[in-house]
């Protein structure tokens, strides 16, 4: 589980999967941009906007003794940035690699669970991060996916 927690750190595994998919098929570059934007949004919203405002202490900082298996993060606990980036990446990468959905979502789920297992997040941190990641993926997709021209015609023209 520590390995999964490390794999999710910094979004590196998701960027690597994206690069491999683009290397295999150059037509996936727009989709890769969506993945990278979703990861960037997930980081910005969790670590720069929400964590400093909520300022929730990590489980190992409380009165109950919590065993920490991984290194102790210096940031606040809620929401989980690992869960946010993993869900954002799994959702956006699923569009690039539909056959890999099971692998992507399994990895995202295991990364989230690993954060609880290694003692650095509460379950609600992971759930909140996952919901945030979902929202970031939807926003990134909306911003970077071209829309067909509107067929609406103004009747007064």
Predicted regions and their residues:
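Terminal transmembrane helix and immediately flanking juxtamembrane interfaces
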Residues: 1-47, 51, 123-157
